[in-house]
A protein has these predicted regions:
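His/Glu-based metal-binding/catalytic segments typifying zinc-dependent metallopeptidases
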Residues: 139-196, 302, 347
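Charge-rich, well-structured scaffold segments of protease-associated domains
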Residues: 1-139, 155, 172-173, 181, ...
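Short amphipathic alpha-helix segments
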Residues: 196-204
């Protein structure tokens, strides 16, 4: 069984890829982990050491470090915390605290099990009833999401041969009107090598080694984020051009650009659904957010229906600027007050 475990902003996750005939044994292991974790004392120190090393290694991954620092400033507490944790918290955690956290947060009320592959539904249902039918636990109570922080610019000074630029701006929530128009708009900017950011910053001018934009959303928030990895000498021009492309998008998209962007999104959707693992993950996410699973046709049709007017309407209601910007590198950059609304401050 190839497996993985993860923590996110508002949930824990377990995943696995395996031969279909091994599903009963795999679900037995998952059942044991979520209902009766052993958490052997002798292994906790080894895991703590690895996690502390991951924190130190963040200094060797400037792109991720910039993202962590941006999220800490952009999202409301406690949702702005990194899944890496912090050194003080990791050192203070012991087995009793972890077991108490398990009792508090792990329950069947919002648990979702998604299985995709060469399996029969009735057999999966019988396994789930046998292995999880007696699961007890109170529903976890998450705090209200709160408000996104006021837009600001912050710089983290690091003596490096690289410069990192990251930004975030509020957008439409998952499932709200304009959600698919928002996805298409961001795809036009930077989800592939055909996006405007890649073409303008990297292909035409050679300003950076990496650039992209993404749209992320759940039922509590929506966020447009962008990243540029460049050199200190080209950082200011890269930032200026990045902001310029964000502000230029409304009213400038051609029908050909729109068609290409939607085709790329639909191709990625189809290719992703060919993997049982991706299908299981998307089904679980849909159920978590919507309480139902969207069909491939539903998503495909929603993307197809997005028009140029829809994109411009989205951009009118959710402009990419003002935004929150963080840079990481040798020196701070010049950022217009109209872009961030608040003066720069040290990170």
């Amino acid at each position: 069984i190839r497996h993985g475990e993860w923590t996110g902003m508002d949930r824990f996750g377990f995943s696995g890829s395996l031969i279909a005939s091994k599903l009963p044994r795999a679900l037995e292991l998952v059942s044991s982990m979520v209902q009766e974790p052993r958490l052997p004392e002798e292994e906790i120190e080894n895991i703590r050491s690895v996690l502390l090393q991951d924190l130190v290694a963040l200094n060797d991954n400037p792109a991720r470090r910039a993202s962590v620092e941006l999220n800490r400033r952009y999202y409301p507490a406690p949702f702005n915390r990194s899944s890496l944790g912090d050194a003080a918290g990791l050192k203070a955690t012991d087995r009793s605290r972890m077991l108490a956290l398990h009792r508090e947060l792990f329950g069947p009320q919002r648990a979702i099990l998604s299985v995709a592959g060469k399996v029969k539904a009735d057999e999966v249902f019988r396994l789930v009833e046998r292995l999880f039918g007696g699961w007890q636990g109170a529903p976890a109570q998450l705090p209200p999401f709160g408000r996104i922080s006021p837009h600001e610019y912050a710089h983290l000074e690091v003596d490096s041969a690289q410069a990192q630029i990251v930004l975030a701006s509020p957008s439409v929530k998952f499932g709200e009107e304009g959600y698919y128009a928002g996805k298409v708009a961001v795809s036009l900017l930077g989800s592939s090598m055909f996006g405007r950011l890649f073409m303008e910053l990297r292909e035409k001018r050679g300003l950076c080694y990496s650039v992209y934009a993404r749209h992320g959303a759940n039922t509590s928030y929506g966020t447009v984020s962008a990243y540029v990895g460049t050199t200190p000498e080209r950082a200011q021009e890269s930032l200026d051009l990045l902001v310029g492309e964000l502000e230029r998008l409304k009213g400038s998209v051609t029908q050909a650009e729109l068609a290409r962007s939607k085709t790329n999104m639909q191709a990625s959707l189809v290719m992703g659904e060919e993997s049982p693992g991706s299908r299981a993950a998307s089904n679980a996410t849909d159920w978590w957010l919507l309480g139902r699973v969207r069909s491939l046709k539903e998503v495909n049709d929603a993307i197809s229906a997005v028009s140029l007017d829809d994109v411009d309407s989205f951009l009118s209601r959710h402009p990419f600027t003002p935004c929150t910007i963080l840079t990481l590198g040798r020196a701070p950059l010049e950022v217009s007050s109209s872009v961030t609304k608040h003066r720069s401050q040290p990170a």
